[in-house]
Regions:
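Long C-terminal subdomains/extensions of small-metabolite kinases
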Residues: 1-168
Length: 168
């Protein structure tokens, strides 16, 4: 079960390296980015089977996002909504330091040459070979197939009486 963002590819590889590191925080991620970039076998080929469409895409990362941001604060899914019954499949086509830095700004628009977003209700995602997979920041292992759908029932969360949601 994923509440936030999961992905296949280079970010999951980064999380795998980070989990085995002695350094934590942003500095730890920065240090682990070097072995990740040099040891990963990207780009990867992804096949996304949705209800009425089939997509075959290449990229360095395929994210499954119901929320907007990674834990690092990178805003990778600015149009994502938690309450619309859909999630976004984000295919990051290449590594671009400029575009990665751009995601750290609140209202940054995503460049279609960098990332492609597909908004869907359910999907079966397959890869040619097992690829690193993470769920909500936890490395799960390598996977060739991932099945994704929005759960029918909502998760109940306790909030203060005076809580006002940020969206309607």
């Amino acid at each position: 079960m994923c509440l936030h963002i999961s992905d296949l590819g280079i970010n999951a590889e980064l999380i795998r390296h980070y989990e085995h590191s002695n350094f934590r925080g942003m500095f730890g991620y920065f240090l682990q980015s070097f072995p990740t970039l040099f040891k990963s076998n990207y780009p990867y080929k992804f096949t996304i089977e949705a209800k009425e469409h089939r997509y075959v895409k290449k990229g360095v990362l395929l994210a499954i996002a119901n929320a907007n941001k990674f834990g690092t604060g990178a805003n990778v899914n600015p149009d994502g909504k938690l309450n619309d019954g859909k999630f976004e499949v984000l295919i990051f086509k290449r590594i671009s330091l400029f575009h990665i830095i751009k995601t750290l700004f609140k209202n940054a628009e995503m460049d279609s040459n960098f990332v492609e977003a597909i908004s869907i209700e359910e999907a079966i995602i397959t890869c040619e070979k097992p690829i690193a997979f993470q769920i909500d920041g936890e490395f799960i292992g390598k996977r060739k197939k991932v099945e994704v759908k929005v759960a029918d029932k909502r998760l109940r969360i306790a909030v203060p009486k005076d809580f006002v949601p940020a969206y309607n």
